[in-house]
Design a protein with these regions (language model features):
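Nucleotide-activated sugar donor-binding and catalytic core shared by glycosyltransferases
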Residues: 1-84, 89-207
């Protein structure tokens, strides 16, 4: 017997049970309507972009390209603010400080705990990331995701239109982010199911 968290790997396999995704289930407990955080308060009235970027393969020029695209967006759209909980990796911090320094509408903050970050995503207009798990969590909150990578392990999100695969080059990231900001219908998405409700989801998938 095989157990999986989503539908798409099951298409050509027998004896598979969908068990749900506990990562998504956690959102029911962490996201709160009465949550308050000073950074989220700072961003009220703006279109908030939450950023995560730390993948080792992006260190160096690829990461600088990402950050330059983000800064270009902030400089162009005066109603956009960015909150970036910076990874503890010294290389990431150095690049972030160099590329974002002096930009008042980009806040570099310390890493958040899971409750804080889930509520940051909920308060955001969109999320820009090179991370994997966020590609599942953000769509479950109804938030579009701009994936700053060339590939993704979540192709079902791309097919559903909740993930926007931009690559890691500055012009591509800038162009895709600008599209999401200037075409509001691209960000008005319904929360994706993303296989939550683990206790109630154990069912056999027919091949």
């Amino acid at each position: 017997m095989h157990q999986i968290a989503a539908q798409w790997p099951a298409k050509a396999m027998a004896q598979i049970f969908i068990t749900g995704n506990t990562e998504i289930d956690a959102l029911h407990y962490t996201v709160r309507n009465d949550f308050h955080h000073p950074e989220i308060e700072w961003a009220k009235g703006s279109r908030l972009i939450a950023v995560t970027a730390h993948k080792r393969e992006n260190l160096g020029e690829p990461m600088r390209d990402m950050f330059r695209a983000i800064r270009r967006i902030v400089e162009e759209f005066t109603d956009v603010k960015v909150i970036y909980p910076v990874h503890l990796n010294p290389q990431v911090r150095k690049i972030a400080d160099e590329e974002f320094g002096g930009c008042e509408r980009i806040h570099l903050i310390e890493p958040l705990d899971v409750v804080e970050f889930h509520n940051l995503m909920k308060a955001s207009y969109l999320i820009m990331t090179d991370s994997g798990g966020i590609q599942e969590e953000a769509p479950a909150l109804g938030k579009p995701v701009l994936v700053m990578r060339d590939t993704t392990e979540r192709p079902e999100g791309v097919e559903a239109g909740t993930l926007n695969l931009a690559g890691a080059r500055m012009e591509d990231i800038y162009r895709e982010c600008r599209r999401l900001l200037t075409e509001p219908e691209k960000t008005n998405i319904c929360p994706a199911e993303m296989a939550g409700n683990s206790p109630g989801r154990r069912k056999k998938v027919d091949s």
